[in-house]
Structure formats: C-alpha cells, structure tokens
C-alpha cells in the first residue's frame, strides 16, 4: 500500500504525537504517503465535567476506533493511558514506541515544589489518581477539577485560578513546554497512570500490511512494561475514571518490576504493592490481587457508585 490514513485526535498534543509517529514511519517506508484524519472524541467534547462523572471507558478513543472498523483510517495514534485495558475484538496495538518520561509534574505560579506550596494551596487536576496521591501526601491541599488541553490548563494557572496544576511530563515535553515544569513528582509520591509516557498505534488485527509496517516501530521493553501495567488495570476493571496507578520497569533478563496503587479520592486510604516477574500478564494479576486482598476493591466499588450518581 502506498497510502496510509492515520486517525488522531484534534488537540495540539495529539497532532504533535501523530506527526512524530508519521515522521518515524517514513523512515521505514520512504515511498509511503500518510494522510491525517482528525477525529473529535466524546472526551474532547465534554469539558465542563470531570472525567470520572462523564462515565464509560475509552472516552478519547471510541470514535477513533470506529473509524478503523469503518476503514476510514488504517491506523491510529493514541496516548496509551487513554486506552481501556481491553481492546474491541478485531483491533490490536500494532506498535508501542519507546516510552518517554512517565512521571507527573507540578507547575506552580512561582516555581514552588509540592513541599513549598502554601498551606491550603489550590491545585488543579481532573484525575482522581493524581488527587488521591497528592492528598495522601499533603492532606491540607485543596483540589479543584481542571479539564482542557495543555494550553488551556496553563492559561488558567497563569491567570491565578490555581496555585499549581499537575500534568504529565510526556505531554509537556512533546510540545516543548519542559521549561514550565516546577517539579518532576517522584513515582513514590505520584505513581503514574497505566501506560503514561507511552504511545499506542492501533490497527485492524487482519491488516497484515499495516501490521508489518508498525512492527518495525515496536519497542520490546516498553511493551513488556506497559503489558504488565495494563494487565493490572484489566484485573481491577479500571479506566481513567478511577484512582488507579501503575508503573513497571524492565531490568536484566527481561525481569519486570511492577508497582500498583489504588487510593480513595480523599487520599485517606492508599493501597500499594510491588512485585517482580518475567510474565507481564501474570505479574499484573498478582499485584492487583495483592491490592484486592488489602481491601482495594471496596474503595473502587465506592468510587464507581459515586461516579454513577
């Protein structure tokens, strides 16, 4: 095939990521032509409600996946953290490029770190995972929902609506805003979202030509790490609307170390477990079961009940 149609969200970050992927793929297929198809998702349309209240999984991917099924696109570029743990039948992740920085970062008005923020500081985030962990570390902090693209969030900080906001390092680095970062939050304080810092290139499972192209761009250690994280998420039946975090690293002999967390939205209950192994799927299940044994299931059930109200 000389031409590939590429599905992407319309945001500045999504387009930057997709163009980066296309540039890399041109290295593997110099003669190929790539055509971007910009798609607006449910998560992009509903900006006045926190993600946990919008409900459902795959808020930023469903419409894009439909375009793959309808053969309007051949492959799509996603932030892996936006993807549900289970893909629809007929679709696969054809490539996971090498992960960039997975950490959360703090941006504050005057460069203050999390420890330096004043008592009762107002921090903006729409992520239950982030707010849970920040409140566990600094219970005095006030959390307020913050939705929108990177530019919108940074503008609200600059206008004085917040003392600080929390974003993903990867997104800021991809749009060259690293200079705005006040602090990279250690994973011990804020465990990242499943797959944070990684991209996923999704295509139809029976599209051998596209799979052959994408396979060349797959990073094996990243795939191992995020497979463990996604197995953990799948076992807990979580999406981006629940306070779940996970981060895996791959060492010698493909030994994977996975840490998983579940927290209550107020940060008063925090469950964490770390384990190592070589089978990413088994490891994810093992860490999830350890948290469920500690009582994490009750917290998740309560969050889901609140989201439905």
Curated annotation (Swiss-Prot):
Record's cofactor remark: Binds 1 dipyrromethane group covalently.
Keyword Cytoplasm set for record: no
Residues bearing PTM S-(dipyrrolylmethanemethyl)cysteine: 240
Catalyzed reactions per annotation: 4 porphobilinogen + H2O = hydroxymethylbilane + 4 NH4(+)
GO cellular component, one term: cytoplasm
EC number per UniProt: 2.5.1.61
Gene3D superfamilies (alphabetical): Periplasmic binding protein-like II, Porphobilinogen deaminase, C-terminal domain
Cofactor: dipyrromethane
Any GO MF annotation of the entry: hydroxymethylbilane synthase activity
Matches recorded under InterPro entries: HemC, Porphobilin_deaminase_cofac_BS, Porphobilin_deaminase_N, Porphobilinogen_deaminase_C, Porphobilinogen_deaminase_C_sf
Recorded metabolic or biological pathway in which this protein acts: Porphyrin-containing compound metabolism; protoporphyrin-IX biosynthesis; coproporphyrinogen-III from 5-aminolevulinate: step 2/4
UniProt keyword list: Porphyrin biosynthesis, Transferase
One Pfam family it belongs to: Porphobil_deam
GO BP annotations listed: protoporphyrinogen IX biosynthetic process
Protein family (similarity comment): Belongs to the HMBS family.
Function statement: Tetrapolymerization of the monopyrrole PBG into the hydroxymethylbilane pre-uroporphyrinogen in several discrete steps.
Subunit structure: Monomer.
Miscellaneous: The porphobilinogen subunits are added to the dipyrromethane group.
PANTHER family listed in its UniProt record: PORPHOBILINOGEN DEAMINASE
HAMAP family the UniProt entry points to: Porphobil_deam
Entry protein name: Porphobilinogen deaminase
Organism: Brevibacillus brevis (strain 47 / JCM 6285 / NBRC 100599)
Lineage of origin: Bacteria, Bacillati, Bacillota, Bacilli, Bacillales
């Amino acid at each position: 095939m000389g031409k590939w149609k590429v599905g992407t969200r319309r945001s500045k970050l999504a387009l930057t990521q997709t163009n980066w992927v296309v540039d890399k793929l041109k290295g593997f297929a110099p003669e190929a032509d790539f055509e971007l198809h910009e798609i607006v998702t449910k998560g992009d349309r509903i900006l006045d409600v926190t993600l946990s209240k919008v409900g459902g999984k795959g808020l930023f991917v469903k419409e894009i996946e439909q375009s793959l099924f309808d053969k309007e696109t051949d492959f799509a570029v996603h932030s892996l953290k936006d993807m549900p743990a289970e893909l629809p039948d007929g679709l696969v992740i054809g490539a996971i490029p090498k992960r960039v920085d997975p950490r959360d970062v703090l941006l504050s008005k005057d460069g203050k770190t999390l420890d330096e923020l004043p008592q009762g500081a107002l921090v903006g985030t729409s992520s239950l995972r982030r707010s849970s962990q920040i409140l566990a570390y600094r219970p005095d902090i006030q959390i307020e929902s913050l939705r929108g693209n990177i530019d919108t969030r940074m503008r609200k900080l600059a206008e004085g609506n917040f003392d600080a906001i929390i974003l993903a390092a990867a997104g800021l680095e991809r749009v060259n805003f690293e200079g705005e970062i006040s602090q990279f939050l250690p994973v011990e304080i804020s465990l990242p979202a499943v797959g944070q810092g990684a991209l996923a290139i999704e295509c139809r499972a029976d599209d051998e030509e596209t799979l052959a192209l994408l396979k060349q761009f797959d990073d094996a250690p990243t795939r191992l790490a995020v497979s463990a994280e996604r197995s953990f998420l799948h076992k807990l039946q979580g999406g981006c609307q629940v306070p779940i975090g996970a981060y895996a690293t791959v060492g010698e002999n493909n030994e994977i170390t996975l840490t998983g967390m579940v927290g209550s939205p107020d940060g008063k209950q925090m469950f964490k477990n770390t384990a190592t192994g070589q089978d990413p799927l088994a490891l994810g299940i093992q860490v999830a079961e350890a948290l469920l044994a500690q009582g994490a299931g009750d917290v998740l059930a309560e969050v889901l009940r609140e989201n439905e109200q």
